Amino acid sequence: MRLDKYLKVSRIIKRRTVAKEASEGGRVTINGKAAKPSSEVKPGDVLEIRFGEKMARYRIVSVAETVRKENAAAMYELLGGEEIE
């Protein structure tokens, strides 16, 4: 699944356009490497996302095309940093 779509479906970032801008701006890495919006993600990958002055690390647990809002948090595991809504 594309990175920008995963960030939106998992609700780590609420809108796909914002997810795309974040990755184009160099604020998202996959397994320590800079990521483009079209980068593919899979279970086990570690995402690092900079939100202003804060950094959050997530491990991808599952990938699904659609998911209910209440189940979205089960798609990832927060590894560290501070979660931003």
Predicted segment positions?
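Extended boundary segments
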Residues: 1-11
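Strongly charged
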Residues: 5, 16-21, 27-85
